[in-house]
């Protein structure tokens, strides 16, 4: 248990940041799920819109430090590849 005031404040700050980061991570997962659903449905237009939202949310999480930059880029790259595959299958 923290004894000095600085350590107690650090615990309070960490708790607040953890709550915010958890919400951000959850939001990213929600947008990724929407993209997955659009891909499963096979609707290229909806998937494209969902991809743009998911990419935006992932990069926002990267800029806030919730997700490592390489992880965010890798996920976006894989999502884009899957979207491209869907577009080519539809064409």
UniProtKB/Swiss-Prot annotation:
A cellular-component GO term for this protein: cytosol
Keyword Ribosomal protein carried by entry? yes
Q: Name the InterPro entries for this protein.
A: Ribosomal_bS20, Ribosomal_bS20_sf
GO MF terms listed in the record are: small ribosomal subunit rRNA binding; structural constituent of ribosome
Physiological role: Binds directly to 16S ribosomal RNA.
Q: Cite the PANTHER family for this sequence.
A: 30S RIBOSOMAL PROTEIN S20 (PTHR33398), SMALL RIBOSOMAL SUBUNIT PROTEIN BS20C (PTHR33398:SF1)
Q: Where is the signal peptide?
A: none
Mind listing the GO biological process terms from this record? translation
Q: What is this protein called?
A: Small ribosomal subunit protein bS20
Q: Does the keyword rRNA-binding apply?
A: yes
Keywords in UniProt for this one?
Answer: Ribonucleoprotein, Ribosomal protein, RNA-binding, rRNA-binding
Q: Which family does it belong to?
A: Belongs to the bacterial ribosomal protein bS20 family.
């Amino acid at each position: 248990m923290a004894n000095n005031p600085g350590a107690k404040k650090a615990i309070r700050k960490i708790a607040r940041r953890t709550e915010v980061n958890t919400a951000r991570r959850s939001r990213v997962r929600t947008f990724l799920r929407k993209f997955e659903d659009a891909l499963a449905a096979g609707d290229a237009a909806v998937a494209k819109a969902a991809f743009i939202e998911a990419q935006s949310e992932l990069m926002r999480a990267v800029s806030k430090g919730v997700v490592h930059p390489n992880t965010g880029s890798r996920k976006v790259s894989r999502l884009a590849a899957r979207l491209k595959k869907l577009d080519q299958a539809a064409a």
